Amino acid sequence: MSRRYFGTDGIRGRANGLITPELALKVGQAAGLVFQRGDHRHRVVIGKDTRLSGYMIENAMVAGFTSVGMDVLLVGPMPTPAVAMLTKSMRADLGVMISASHNMFEDNGIKLFGPLGFKLSDDVEKQIELLLDESLDKKLAASASLGRARRIDGVHDRYIEFAKRTLPRDLSLDGLRVVVDCANGAAYKVVPEALWELGADVISIGVEPDGFNINKECGSTAPEALCRKVREMRADIGIALDGDADRVIMVDERGHVVDGDQLLAVIAQSWKEDGRLAKPGVVATVMSNLGLERFLAAEGIDLVRTSVGDRYVLEQMMKGGYNVGGEASGHIILSDYNTTGDGFVAALQVLAVVQKLRRPVSEVCHRFDPLPQILKNVRYRNGRPLDDAGVQSAIHAGETRLNGHGRLLIRASGTEPVIRVMGEGEDRIMVEEVVDVIVDALGSASAAAA
């Protein structure tokens, strides 16, 4: 069965376009019906980021869940990993995060978590999709069985304490000047507070959300402001989260970006030395740089690759018994602590290494020289540009040219109408030329289909 609503990370699209109040209400009803298992009183935790449309979607989902008899616990703006953690901690049947992650404010989305805090399997999402296309009028709760909604206080402190407990009790961040960019998103309160409680000298940017400025020239997808601020304030390190704080990148004292691949290298090497790696392996995606794979191999650590998407990384981690995984984009999953990517907890593990080694971040966090990698996105409106004969010819020619010297990865995004073209190889000029030819072919195919 093809999926109409769910992509690789829940349901996502333009607010009041795809993501309407009607859809949000129906998702609440459908998910509520699927997760009403057993005879106990059922409840759902709902969190959100700071987008203007979050109010609209939140209220619609409350109506949907309560109409099928589920109680709703509202936690307000909170990081996605916090919602996953709270779902399990509060013994809820279901968790919801209203967010479009790193997208701009015009978009929004709905992420769902099961009672143990894990994202839903494909099979469960299909069950919900089937109900979305049905009339649910005859499945609504009786008047006396409707759900209630209440706002929960103190959830920020719960997540702060949870994050702090991932570090040794005797470890302090005293003496470390940290600039943190919260992307004007869900972490704008909790992360600066947690860093301060751990003893860091904290400088915060991206902590003034207005409903419109989430991810706007800030956060993990736009680290330029953080790089400047780190240099300006002579900070030791910078931390950039995205709008829902499930991904992180970092910046060294020179203002140079440290991506997810480098963070995986730091954590994996440190955890192996400390005997904390469950297995001598790390899970990453096909997008991770070959330099990471070579570095880990030299450390006696295997790199297991998956399709793009943190859900696939987690699935492989669970299947293979690994406890460290992630993506170059900054989704870092440490399954000893959480059930999904947690940007802040990952950052704390890196800060712990920095404090332990007492060396500059530029020495600690740049563990390998990445191979030149070019990534370009081609947006399209209609059709299937990857099936175009001209595009296929360009891809074949590129693969032939890079044979033995690099690799190509061309894929459609699972969350937006974009084709991602990635080339990697030892000769940067050759890689750029190959990628540009494919991008031009995709652009022509997209224009022809419009």
From Swiss-Prot:
Cofactor binding, note field: Binds 1 Mg(2+) ion per subunit.
Q: Does the keyword Cytoplasm apply?
A: no
Among Pfam families, the record links this protein to:
PGM_PMM_I (PF02878), PGM_PMM_II (PF02879), PGM_PMM_III (PF02880), PGM_PMM_IV (PF00408)
Keyword set includes Phosphoprotein = yes
Phosphoserine is found on 101
What InterPro entries has UniProt attached to this entry? A-D-PHexomutase_a/b/a-I, A-D-PHexomutase_a/b/a-I/II/III, A-D-PHexomutase_a/b/a-II, A-D-PHexomutase_a/b/a-III, A-D-PHexomutase_C, A-D-PHexomutase_C_sf, Alpha-D-phosphohexomutase_SF, GlmM_bact
Which enzyme type, at the first EC level? Answer: isomerase
**GO molecular function terms listed in the Swiss-Prot or TrEMBL record:** magnesium ion binding; phosphoglucosamine mutase activity; phosphomannomutase activity
Q: Which UniProt keywords apply?
A: Isomerase, Magnesium, Metal-binding, Phosphoprotein
Q: Which GO terms describe its biological process?
A: carbohydrate metabolic process; peptidoglycan biosynthetic process; UDP-N-acetylglucosamine biosynthetic process
Q: What is its EC number?
A: 5.4.2.10
**Modifications made to the protein after synthesis:** Activated by phosphorylation.
Question: Which reaction does this chain catalyze?
Answer: alpha-D-glucosamine 1-phosphate = D-glucosamine 6-phosphate
The record's Gene Ontology cellular component field reads: cytosol
Q: Where, in this chain's numbering, is Mg(2+) bound?
A: 101, 242, 244, 246
* Reported cofactor(s): Mg(2+)
Q: Which domain of life is it from?
A: Bacteria
Catalytic positions? 101
Q: Which family does it belong to?
A: Belongs to the phosphohexose mutase family.
Q: What does this protein do?
A: Catalyzes the conversion of glucosamine-6-phosphate to glucosamine-1-phosphate.
Q: What is this protein identified as? A: Phosphoglucosamine mutase
Which organism is this protein's natural source?
A: Rhodopseudomonas palustris (strain BisB5)
